[in-house]
């Protein structure tokens, strides 16, 4: 599979100079042999930059393949589009677009988004702008990509310049919230970030134990509740204070899973948000809502409610590798205007991937 330069440049920016030794790029002694020529200085085939470039390419290819594999079920649903467009002709436009519309609906693009996409294609076909099946396919992909890559929609984490940056992880029960936090910690740690975890889920008895396992697994420090009746806001406040005093880069704050209809628990999130903001001005930098990809369009009411209460800055969509409803990604971004930051495309610790709109579109419309 070809790996785009965008993927390579993105990944190059994600490799921290502090993590080079950990990923096997050092020591350099005896290996880095620059060759001077009249025009340039280049590294030998076994040198640092050669190995760094190879590592970046391999990592980029691996990440793209994971995303491609993760959306296999959605891609199967949408494969009918290729069949429809293979022998497309103008006389069959209405039939083809009706079946294309059905394929998008089955994949949970939602009625509003689906109608908008199909009617735009119809208009371009009838005006003569689109004259072949391949042109229609390209226009379909471009239309979806435009919805995902809106202006001012930042898919990267916005961590600001004050340390520590604070990231709150919120969501309903069973969405993969604590697991996503652990995987995010693993990713940040491997990039050379000093990470502190905060076990703010004081409602579920096993939550703290689960996060402690993730802390041990990722090599991160953790702050847990003192006593059975500790308040979540107190735990998070204590963690952010420690993060500030001990020079941590990021504090990842777990919170109790809650139904979006439970007002008292939603109020607790407001208290948590205020508590961390008192320690570090502008915190939390990110409030990430974890949503189960298997719920499809049913995630929209959850996202709306959480957003109204605490102001969601980004989404983590989990369990998409087992879902045929990948179109919900487009719906939630387009209807709520909240960017997807990460997607879960597998059970492995490395399978929480930064969301790349172009890679996503290529994965569902192969």
UniProtKB/Swiss-Prot annotation:
- Mind listing the GO molecular function terms for this protein? ATP hydrolysis activity; GTP binding; metal ion binding
Q: Which domain of life is it from?
A: Eukaryota
Indicate what this protein is called per its UniProt record: Cell division protein FtsY homolog, chloroplastic
Q: Which GO terms describe its cellular component?
A: chloroplast stroma; chloroplast thylakoid membrane
Q: Where is the signal peptide?
A: none
Q: What does the record's miscellaneous section state?
A: Unlike eukaryotic or prokaryotic signal recognition particle (SRP), the chloroplast SRP from higher plants lacks an SRP-RNA component. It targets both chloroplast-encoded and nucleus-encoded substrates to the thylakoid membrane, post-translationally for the nucleus-encoded proteins and co-translationally for the chloroplast-encoded proteins.
User: What binding partners and quaternary form does the record give?
Assistant: Monomer. Interacts with FFC/cpSRP54, a component of the cpSRP complex, composed of a FFC/cpSRP54 monomer and a CAO/cpSRP43 dimer. The complex with FFC/cpSRP54 is formed when both proteins are bound with GTP.
Entry keywords, A to Z: Chloroplast, GTP-binding, Membrane, Metal-binding, Nucleotide-binding, Plastid, Receptor, Thylakoid, Transit peptide
Q: What induces it?
A: Not induced by light or iron.
Effect of mutating residue 49 to A: Reduced binding to the thylakoid and 40% reduction of LHCP integration in thylakoids. Reduced binding to the thylakoid and 80% reduction of LHCP integration in thylakoids
């Amino acid at each position: 599979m070809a790996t785009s330069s965008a993927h390579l440049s993105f990944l190059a920016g994600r490799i921290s100079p502090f993590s080079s030794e950990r990923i096997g790029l050092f020591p350099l002694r005896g290996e880095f042999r620059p060759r001077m020529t009249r025009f340039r200085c280049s590294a030998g085939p076994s040198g640092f930059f050669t190995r760094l470039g190879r590592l970046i390419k391999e990592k980029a290819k691996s990440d793209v393949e994971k995303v491609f594999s993760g959306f296999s079920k959605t891609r199967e649903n949408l494969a009918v589009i290729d069949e429809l467009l293979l022998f497309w002709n103008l006389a069959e436009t209405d039939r083809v677009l009706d079946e294309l519309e059905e394929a998008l609906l089955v994949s949970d693009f939602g009625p509003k988004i689906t109608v908008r996409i199909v009617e735009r294609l119809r208009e371009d076909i009838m005006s003569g702008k689109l004259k072949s099946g391949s042109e229609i396919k390209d226009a379909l992909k471009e239309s979806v990509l435009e919805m995902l890559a809106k202006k001012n929609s930042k898919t990267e984490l916005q961590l600001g310049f004050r340390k520590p940056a604070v990231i709150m992880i919120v969501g309903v029960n069973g969405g993969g919230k604590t697991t996503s936090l652990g995987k995010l910690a693993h990713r940040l740690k491997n990039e050379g970030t000093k990470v502190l975890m905060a076990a703010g889920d004081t409602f579920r008895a096993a939550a703290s134990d689960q996060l402690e396992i993730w802390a041990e697994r990722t090599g991160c420090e953790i702050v847990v509740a003192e006593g059975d009746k500790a308040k979540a806001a107190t735990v998070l406040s204590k963690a952010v204070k420690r993060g500030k005093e001990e020079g941590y880069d990021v504090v990842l704050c777990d919170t109790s899973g809650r139904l979006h209809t439970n007002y008292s628990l939603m109020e607790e999130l407001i208290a948590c948000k205020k508590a961390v903001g008192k320690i570090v001005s502008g915190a939390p930098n990110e409030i990430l809502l974890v949503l189960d990809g298997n719920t499809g369009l049913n995630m929209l009411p959850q996202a709306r409610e959480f957003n109204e209460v605490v102001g969601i800055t980004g989404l983590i969509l989990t369990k998409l590798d087992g879902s045929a409803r990948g179109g919900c990604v487009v719906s939630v971004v387009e209807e709520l205007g909240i960017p997807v930051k990460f997607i879960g495309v597998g059970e492995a610790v490395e399978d929480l991937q930064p969301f790349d709109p172009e890679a996503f579109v290529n994965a569902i419309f192969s």
